[in-house]
């Protein structure tokens, strides 16, 4: 019995061929685990890329993709066209403004010429009138000359000017001066 009890108290011996497996090895190689992780990531992305390709190829209708691309191309074409159109209208507007400025300069030179002529005529009138004549006569003569010149100038440019331009404002002043001189 004692030999029997001694046998029962002893645990059976494990075979030497199959030692117990450790869950985590003692020496882990970082490069191999990193390489396996990268391979796993690449595999996952390749599957998702293939699935995206399959979904867009067979499940999403290609007409939707084509219409979206066509819409984007048309919007881009429209914006390019409108941008070019705006640039062309801006250059044309500058040309029109330049022409208006040139016309204004020509009219100002015409006005200066008329004023020089009025000044020359008044000088001639002052020289012709004797020193004994009254101041009333010289004012009346100058008023007649200025009225004639202003009437001639106003009739030349009356139809071609707008009142919001500098020449138009000058024309308004001339008309008001004319009415004041007539009332004197």
Swiss-Prot record:
Keyword Transmembrane helix: yes
Lineage of the species this protein comes from: Eukaryota, Fungi, Dikarya, Ascomycota, Taphrinomycotina
Major subcellular location class: membrane
Protein name per Swiss-Prot or TrEMBL: Uncharacterized protein C23H4.13c
Bilayer disposition of the protein: Single-pass membrane protein
Keywords assigned by UniProt, alphabetized: Membrane, Transmembrane, Transmembrane helix
Localization per Swiss-Prot or TrEMBL: Membrane
Any one of the GO CC terms: cytoplasm
Organism annotation: Schizosaccharomyces pombe (strain 972 / ATCC 24843)
Organism superkingdom: Eukaryota
TM segment ranges: 35-55
